[in-house]
Each structure stands twice: as structure tokens, then as C-alpha cells.
Amino acid sequence: MFQKFDIIVVGAGHAGCEAARSSALMGAETLLITQNLNAIAQLSCNPAMGGVAKGQIVREIDALGGMSGIITDQNTMQFRMLNRSKGPAMWSPRAQVDNVSFGISWRQHLETISHLQLWQDEVVDLIINNGTVEGVVTKIGLNLQVDLSATIQ
């Protein structure tokens, strides 16, 4: 049913989406497993991207070619620069985004990427051989293998 994958990413939160996207764009056959395909990149009850700490991370991901900042811009309802009363080194961007459209935008983007497959399931165990993770076992009983001989350019 499934081929062997070069990379299996477990979890489609913000980091999982960025990791799966990056590996697929590098040509690695990538599988992104999530518990709910309708909750990809789901934000918390406070749907903010940015702030003092996360704002710096979003900027760094953007500088490395990531999509979190771009998808945030596409779904922003309000933007504010925090700490304006302090010096410019302390300023921090924060965007309030539409929680539903943000996740939909991420999913639509991921679905356009070659070498990337999305799968709804839950990982319940790892396949380990001589201390090396070789795949995952899912809740519905699939054994999904990683191709350890793959070379990614």
C-alpha cells in the first residue's frame, strides 16, 4: 500500500509542517502523519503568531525559506508591533490570525508539494532495529518503513 519513505514526520503542527515541507522540497519521499487532517497547523485558543520569543523564531524560519510567516501574512486579522515603548531591539511583531483559514492554507500548500504525502493516523510505536529507528507502527496497524539507504541531495 505504501512505499518506503525517506523521511516520516509525525505531527502536523507548525514544526512538523515546516519539516515535512523542507524535506519534500529537497527531494526526499516524505510522509507527514497527523491525527487529524482537518487540524493541520492548528493554533491554540489564542491564535497569535509572533510575540517576543515566537516572533524571533518565525523570522528565522522565514529567513531559511519557511512558510509560517507567509501563511500568517495571508491569514492575518490584526497586526501589532509589541514593546514599542522600548528600544527597537525589543520590538516584536505579533499577528492575530484566523485559526480556521490558517490551517486550511497550510493544508492546501502542503498538498501541492511533490514528494509529500499526508496521512491521517496515530503513531503508537516505533520500529527499531539494532538501535536505529526504521519506521513507525500506526493505530490502524500499518507498519510504515523508512528507506535507510536513501541519499538526499
Annotate each predicted stretch with a short phrase.
Residues 21-132:
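Conserved N-terminal/central alpha/beta ligand/cofactor-binding core
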Residues 127-147:
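Conserved beta-strand-loop-beta-strand element in the redox core of flavoprotein oxidoreductases
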Residues 8-9, 31-32, 137:
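Structured core elements
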Residues 3-5, 140-153:
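Core beta-strand elements of the Rossmann-like FAD/NAD(P) dinucleotide-binding domain
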Residues 2-15:
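Beta1/beta-strand and adjacent pyrophosphate-binding region of the FAD-binding site
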